[in-house]
UniProtKB/Swiss-Prot annotation:
Keywords: Membrane, Transmembrane, Transmembrane helix, Transport. One of its GO terms (cellular component) is membrane. The keyword Acyltransferase does not apply. The gene is DTX6. Disulfide bonds: none annotated. It is found in: Membrane. This is Protein DETOXIFICATION 6. Pfam families: MatE (PF01554). The chain crosses the membrane at residues 38-58, 69-89, 113-133, 146-166, 187-207, 211-231, 263-283, 292-312, 334-354, 376-396, 405-425, 436-456. InterPro entries: MATE_euk, MATE_fam. It comes from the Eukaryota. It comes from Arabidopsis thaliana (Mouse-ear cress). GO terms for biological process: xenobiotic detoxification by transmembrane export across the plasma membrane.
Length: 483
């Protein structure tokens, strides 16, 4: 069994932390505590993200048309489906994380089951939209050949979306209890499963891009299976996997109360990136622009999952400590997360800049595409810095339960600043894809600044009181779950 997530009485950091000369010792202890969770969570997130990336790479090497179609479908399905499932699960980071900190163990399983049941009808509605994706793209002025490939790919992704409706809540169920090593083992096993399955379906069975999409679905369901087996039979989940049927309706209500703004927060952010990809299809030479911006988005997103892992670990620490009534420890966890982000962003930006002339070949054999990617590499390095900062503070928002503030911050940053700047530079200033990506950088920078201001002005004592009201008082009908 892994180490307890919450700190014991004999450890350096306690709930009565005061600004004394021992602050450096307390920070060091919290940094170690956060790092033990951040590294596995970052690895888990990278492994999960690599599944669709591998599918894009395998399909992209078949032809430029396949790459463009898959890129277009990936953009649309991310913002209309996968971001919704990921965002809704953010409610569990607040509810399950604070319930664990408050030692209200029976609530954790009930929240998780309620989330899974609530996700299924949403998947059905999204799937209907995906069935008509090709016609939608054509009506928006996209290339008919690219739209046909994209529509077929999206339909084959529907099983993957349904799997995410289960996988995301199960991931948060384990994550908020600090059970990150099982998540790590399951994610790596799934990645190793996905690679041969994708190659077999695409090349051996000759299914092309559709095979790449089906491989994602098979791999996601494989991950769901092994996660569910662990939850069912592991002694680590004995106190938390129960379900209180009488409180199902209340759990669903609370799930949507925090899940809807959490999903909005995620979808608004993701939608700017996908909107710019769609806009690139209206530029001169749309196949080149769409392919290059897709590579930039894939690279940026692949890096983003690393600080996202740090943000997930920070969310665990913040939510657990707020639930336990330790607001100053939660505040210290924020500083530790920012410190880890700075180290990670510096290293990754430097590596990308050094490899800027060659990394485009991982996605395409076209020299024209690779040269264009090299030109955009300095902007990607800046994206690494600002996106990572926002990811860490986004974890603070989910752990604290102020997703609604994060959603409004994203509206201002991306739709009032980032998107207008990107469209102006891309179309009116004829900077094409480079101008669109500058808009991304502007939006991400504004998001980070707004979240930083909100975090700096936050009353941690008030957040701890709200956590108790949310978990202990408001839902007193739940069982404690303790022996």
């Amino acid at each position: 069994m892994e180490d307890p997530l919450l700190l014991g009485d004999n450890q350096i950091i306690t709930g009565s932390l005061k600004p004394t000369p021992t602050w450096r010792m307390n920070f060091t202890a919290e940094l170690k505590n956060l790092s033990r969770m951040a590294l596995p969570m970052a690895t888990v997130t990278v492994a999960q993200y690599l599944l669709p990336v591998i599918s894009v790479m395998v399909a992209g090497h078949r032809s430029e048309l396949q790459l463009s179609g898959v890129a277009l479908a990936t953009s649309f399905t991310n913002v209309s489906g996968f971001s919704v499932m990921f965002g809704l699960a953010g409610a569990l980071e607040t509810l399950c994380g604070q319930a664990y900190g408050a030692k209200q163990y029976a609530k954790i399983g009930t929240y998780t089951f309620s989330a899974i049941v609530s996700n299924v009808p949403i998947v059905v509605l999204i799937s209907i939209l995906w069935f008509y994706m090709d016609k939608l793209f054509v009506s928006l002025g996209q290339d008919p050949d690219i739209s046909k490939v994209a529509g077929s790919y999206a339909v084959c992704l529907i099983p993957a979306l349904l799997a995410q409706a289960v996988q995301q809540p199960l991931t948060r169920f384990l994550q908020t209890q600090g059970l990150v090593l099982p998540l790590l083992y399951c994610a790596i096993t799934t990645l190793l499963f996905h690679i041969p399955v994708c190659l077999i379906l695409v090349y051996a069975f000759g299914l092309g891009s559709n095979g790449a999409a089906l491989a994602i679905g098979l791999s996601y369901w494989f991950n769901v299976l092994i996660l569910a087996l662990y939850v069912r039979f592991s002694s680590s989940c004995e106190k938390t996997r129960g379900f209180v049927s009488d409180d199902f309706v209340l759990s669903v209500k609370q799930f949507f109360q925090y899940g809807i703004p959490s999903a909005a927060m995620t979808t608004i952010e993701w939608s700017l990136f996908e909107f710019l990809i769609l806009s690139s299809g209206l530029l001169p030479n749309p196949k080149l622009e769409t392919s290059v911006l897709s590579i930039c988005l894939t690279t940026s997103s692949l890096h983003y999952v690393i600080p996202m892992g740090i943000g997930a670990a920070g969310s665990i620490r913040v939510s657990n400590e707020l639930g336990a009534g330790n607001p100053e420890v939660a505040r210290l966890a924020v500083f530790a997360g920012i410190f880890l982000w700075f180290l990670e962003a510096t290293i990754c930006s430097t590596l990308l800049f050094i490899c800027r002339d060659i990394f485009g070949y991982a996605f395409s054999n076209s020299k024209e595409v690779v040269d264009y990617v090299t030109e955009l590499s300095p902007l990607l390095c800046i994206s690494f810095l600002v996106d990572g900062f926002s990811a860490v503070l986004g974890g603070v928002a989910r752990g604290s339960g102020w997703q609604h503030i994060g959603a409004w911050a994203n509206v201002v940053a991306y739709y009032l600043l980032g998107a207008p700047v990107g469209l102006f530079l891309g179309f009116w200033c004829h900077m094409n894809g480079k101008g669109l990506w500058i808009g991304v950088v502007v939006g991400s920078t504004a998001q980070g600044i707004i979240l930083a201001i909100v975090t700096a002005c936050m009353s941690w004592n008030e957040q701890a009181a709200k956590a108790r009201q949310r978990i202990v008082v408001r839902t007193s009908s739940f069982g404690n779950g303790l022996a």
